[in-house]
Amino acid sequence: KARPQREAWVVLACRGNKVLLERRPPSGIWGGLWSLPEFPTRQHAAQWCREHLVGGSELQPEEPLKHAFSHFDYDINPLSVRCAGKAPALRDDDRYRWYDLAAPAAVGVPKPIATLLQRPRR
């Protein structure tokens, strides 16, 4: 029988060589790992960018990525945006951090997200 499908939109907020990562909640999928900010719809993602990024460009859809979990298939829809920075509300603390693609920090990142981060950026 067909496996359940789920989808999410993730934001690749790029500032120079850095991408903004968000720590996931301790429970649930990829609990406690660093990932891209994730949203149930493109509209939610766009709204978050307007509220939390400084000098954000238009959102550019990138090629989706499929990932299979044991119980369902996950479609990840990346939206990339160039920005000058993030709103003061998103402090560099235990929830958000800039991840340098040129010198990756040793943080736990889910494999599909690592795959996205390794794609060449325009």
Predicted segment positions?
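Intrinsically disordered, low-complexity, charged terminal extensions of DNA damage-control enzymes
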Residues: K1-R122
